[in-house]
Regions:
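Positively charged, solvent-exposed patches that mediate nucleic-acid binding
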Residues: 1-98
Length: 98
């Protein structure tokens, strides 16, 4: 996904997507090297997964999605805003969702 997929960046995060041929999306949240402590990584991962959970029903299916976080500024509202903007940029929303 990192080498062949579509890469989009926004302040603090990058999104990589690649079609997977399945009937559902697979989501992974990962971090740059040296990103905070384990507690910070786990909190950021939980926030990212929750934000994705709230918008995944509006997305097209059949993609592998990787969110690479490299900013230690973290809040649910910021992550939701970032994911929404990145998915719009990647044209991953269903036509009915817009």
């Amino acid at each position: 996904v990192f080498k062949k997929g579509l890469k989009l960046s926004l302040n603090g995060v990058s999104l990589f997507t690649l079609p997977n041929g399945l009937e559902y999306n697979r989501f992974l949240c990962t971090f740059r090297r040296g990103f905070g402590s384990a507690v910070m990584r786990n909190r950021s991962r939980r926030i990212s997964k929750e934000a994705y959970r709230h918008i995944k029903h509006r997305l097209k299916t059949g993609n592998d999605i990787i969110l690479l976080v490299f900013s230690e500024k973290d809040s649910y509202s910021l992550r939701l805003e970032q994911l929404t903007a990145l998915f719009l940029k990647a044209k991953m929303y269903n036509d009915e969702a817009l």
